[in-house]
From Swiss-Prot:
The modification Phosphoserine is found at residues 346, 467. The keyword Iron does not apply. Keywords: Acetylation, Cell membrane, Cytoplasm, Isopeptide bond, Membrane, Nucleus, Phosphoprotein, Transcription, Transcription regulation, Ubl conjugation, Unfolded protein response. PANTHER family: TRANSCRIPTIONAL REGULATOR QRICH1, ZINC FINGER MYM-TYPE PROTEIN. GO terms for molecular function: DNA binding. Residues 141-163, 219-242, 420-443 are annotated as: Disordered. The CARD domain may be involved in the regulation of caspase activity in the context of programmed cell death. There is a cross-link at residues 354, 359 (Glycyl lysine isopeptide (Lys-Gly) (interchain with G-Cter in SUMO2)). InterPro entries: DUF3504, ZnF_MYMT-QRICH1. This is Transcriptional regulator QRICH1. GO terms for cellular component: cytoplasm; nucleus; plasma membrane.
Length: 779
């Protein structure tokens, strides 16, 4: 016999090989089927078997598979796939859910039409499952007022579902100011004759002969709610999702229909192949993204008593593209005046001022209403402006909002009324401050060109200095980070074009470097280089460089914007952004709390809550968890220098559990660290006041220092948990969320620890904790 048994394996070995390819979440089902059905179970799992591949990219190992990763502790395995919310008026979105398949008729031609990357935009996106990618060109013939419904035919889109395919009709109507359309789930009794209406901006009617082009493009990731759906013919809605280059998976190429309508946002219809309902990542370098427009329609300026000038965004409901609806407001604050506002504006009929003090946050609004004009004066400063103090009071910048029209007067001035500058002289008794029970009314005048309205503001005289936090942001605003990036990219591109004109043309076809204004579509290398340059070149509206804490706040806003729009790049810890973290460290390393000439300490723009918002604190990744532990050790153990953190070790951090005397079942756990370990004498009795302590946070376990410390120990190698020379271990470059080991046995370098600590010392709560500890030590 010529048949050889060299390449054969036993049945038991074949079962082991097959078991390795079964996904983790189906392993129990595979074993049960193997026990009950025997060899037939191997045939059932023939199609579901997947292969895990490992390949090299730079210095990292990239794991590629199509299985779902089980969730880990503290929601660590949750993927960052968030839907893109429309930011501006022209952006539209249609969400359609349909219980059964929709029959789509398409006329297929031999010559496929190509669509350029600039024509594709997922601002109007509908996902529809398809069996295979095809190239189709469809012609729509319609009237100017109401287009005819397109009729499409193709056998390749029909699914062999036992139920009959239902017909759907799409009608496009025109409507003004249509920003977002969401079609709820249609009852089954209305399925045979359902209608889906898509609203477009008025003034753009479909002319006869406009083309609808279809082209295969990279797959976009559907939202997590679409995973594992049993409906095969359900039409789905997805958004552009660009994931981190470390985590890539192979997907099929779907169909994209691009509706090219002149003057309107380009609509993209994406079809995901049937059976692929997991969160996929496109391998294509050219990404379909959402075009983000400018959010500020006009810009005003404000001048402080010291001569500094800042830019105030003036929010408006008018479209940004109309130059007639934009206005510029200049607000000048005299040095000798404060505590009253005098605004000169267009004729109005009514003015109202309301000042409230709620939860240490004062909100002042002035609403001026007319039939065709509305004016709003906001005394809350822009989040990028530092607090300014004069004579024990705060100068509050005033932002003027044009809602229904433009201002008639081009110049507006803010006059501030000082009760101490009245012509009549006060007696020495009157100049003494009254007791806290007595309050003095301060007059606030809002004067328009037609009439004046006076409103009394009650403010305690015994509190001449309101909280400086009134002028500082309480949370991150991603649109501010995007706006700063856009302004810098426009300025930088203009400089590059100007330099290119003065130089000789480069040899070959090398294109000039241009920074994209859309952060989502920016490549990793381009974004890293752009952020590096921003640390030195970013300027505010007046051309002045940002303060270091404000610049750090802007980068945190950019980080949150990336996460909210489907990018999982961590610009503060990923290896791709090492250059950026080094440049940012050079900016922040010499930051000290700012003190005014009167002795007031200006708090930092960056707060602890902001870092939780943009996932810089928590257990989302090994680097984030390490940063969180360093943050808690700095805040509670008061470790302010790199040397102090280097002395921290696993053996020096003690875990303690206390029982409640009244309730033995009630236990509280804490971790303790001996303060100033080197100053205590040998043999000296250690008391409780010598320890710095971190306590539990039962209200929010995801932010509990004890649980995060336990999770850190759980992810560290067993051999290092008793070491007395290190505490911060080096994170592994690429790990799975449910991997048992996240860190190597090597401690992090001194340079890396210094960069992490520099960013932590800028946080407002850290500065306050250090200031309180220093004050208590002096006393």
């Amino acid at each position: 016999m010529n048949n050889s048994l060299e390449n054969t394996i036993s049945f038991e070995e074949y079962i082991r090989v097959k078991a390795r390819s079964v996904p983790q979440h189906r392993m129990k089902e595979f074993l049960d089927s193997l026990a009950s059905k025997g060899p037939e179970a191997l045939q059932e799992f023939q199609q579901t078997a997947t292969t895990t591949m490992v390949y090299q990219q730079g210095g990292n190992c990239i794991y590629t598979d199509s299985t779902e990763v089980a969730g880990s502790l503290l929601e660590l395995a949750c993927p960052v796939t968030t839907s893109v919310q429309p930011q501006t008026q022209p952006e539209q979105q249609i969400q359609v859910q349909q219980p059964q398949q929709v029959q789509v008729q398409v006329q297929v031609q031999q010559s496929p039409q190509q669509v350029s990357a600039q024509q594709l935009s997922p601002q109007l996106t509908v996902h529809q499952p398809a069996e295979q990618p095809i190239h189709v060109q469809v012609q729509i013939q319609g009237q100017a007022a109401q287009p005819a419904a397109p009729s499409i035919q193709t056998p390749s889109l029909q699914s062999p579902s036992p139920s009959q395919l239902q017909a759907a009709q799409i009608q496009v109507q025109h409507m003004q100011a249509a920003q977002q359309i969401q079609a709820p789930e249609i009852p089954e009794e209305h399925i045979p004759h359902q209608q889906i209406q898509a609203q477009l901006v008025a003034g753009q009617s479909l002319a006869g002969g406009q083309q609808i082009q279809i082209q295969t493009v990279g797959a976009l990731s559907p939202p997590p709610s679409q995973q594992g759906s049993p409906r095969e013919g359900e039409r789905r809605v997805g958004t552009a999702s660009v994931l981190q280059p470390v985590k890539k998976r192979k997907v099929d190429m779907p169909i994209t229909v691009s509706y090219a309508i002149s003057g309107q946002p380009v609509a993209t219809v994406l079809a995901i192949p049937q059976g692929q309902q997991q969160s996929y990542v496109s391998l294509r370098p050219d990404l379909l993204t959402v075009d983000s427009a400018h959010l500020y329609s006009a810009t005003g300026t404000i001048t402080s008593p010291t001569g500094e000038t800042w830019t105030i965004p003036v929010y408006s409901a008018q479209p940004r593209g109309d130059p007639q609806q934009q206005s510029i407001t200049h607000i000048a604050i005299p040095q000798e005046a404060y505590n009253a506002v005098h605004v000169s504006g267009s004729p109005t009929a009514l003015a109202a001022v309301k000042l409230e003090d709620d939860k240490e946050k004062m909100v002042g609004t002035t609403s001026v209403v007319k039939n065709s004009h509305e004016e709003v004066v906001q005394t809350l400063a822009n989040s990028l402006f530092p607090a300014q103090f004069m004579n024990g009071n705060i100068h509050i910048p005033v932002a003027v909002q044009a809602v229904a029209g433009t201002y008639q007067n081009t110049a507006q001035t803010v006059h501030i009324w000082d009760p101490q500058q009245q012509p009549q002289q006060q007696t020495p008794q009157e100049q003494t401050p009254p007791p806290p029970q007595q309050q003095q009314q301060q007059q606030l005048q809002v004067t328009c060109s037609a009439q004046t309205v006076q409103v009394a503001e009650v403010e305690p005289q015994s509190q001449p200095q309101p909280s400086p936090e009134l002028l500082l942001p309480n949370s991150l605003k991603p649109e501010e980070g995007l706006e700063v990036w856009k302004n810098w990219a426009q300025t930088k591109n203009a400089e590059l074009e100007k330099d290119a004109q003065n130089r000789l043309a480069p040899i070959g076809r090398r294109q000039l470097l241009r920074f994209q204004e859309d952060l989502i579509s920016s490549a990793v290398a381009e974004l890293n280089y752009g952020l590096c340059l921003m640390t030195r070149e970013a300027r505010n509206g007046e051309g002045e460089p940002y303060d270091p804490d404000v610049l750090y706040y802007i980068f945190l806003c950019i980080q949150k914007y990336l996460f909210e729009n489907g990018r999982v790049d961590d610009i503060f810890s990923d290896l791709y952004y090492v250059r950026f973290t080094e440049w940012l460290h050079e900016v922040l390393k010499d930051v000290q709390p700012r003190v005014t000439p009167l002795g007031y300490v200006l708090p930092s723009h960056v707060t602890e809550e902001m870092l939780w918002e943009c996932k810089q604190l928590g257990a989302h990744s090994p680097s984030t968890l390490l940063t969180t532990l360093m943050f808690f050790n700095t805040k509670y153990f008061l470790l302010k220098t790199v040397d102090q953190h280097m002395k921290l070790a696993f053996s020096k951090v003690l875990r303690q559990t206390k029982k409640n005397p009244s309730n033995p079942k009630d236990k509280s756990t804490s971790i303790r660290y001996l303060k100033a370990l080197g100053i205590h004498q040998t043999g000296q009795k250690v008391t409780d006041d010598m320890y710095a302590e971190q306590t539990e946070n039962p209200e929010n376990p995801l932010r509990c220092p004890i649980k995060l410390y336990d999770f850190y120990l759980f992810k560290c190698p067993q051999s290092v948990k008793g070491r007395n020379d290190t505490f911060y271990l080096t994170p592994e470059p690429v790990v799975a969320p449910n991997s048992p080991i996240w860190y190597s046995v090597q401690p992090i370098s001194r340079e890396q620890m210094g960069q992490m600590l520099t960013r932590i010392l800028v946080i407002r709560e850290i500065q306050e904790a250090i200031a309180v500890a220093s004050a208590s030590t002096m006393h």
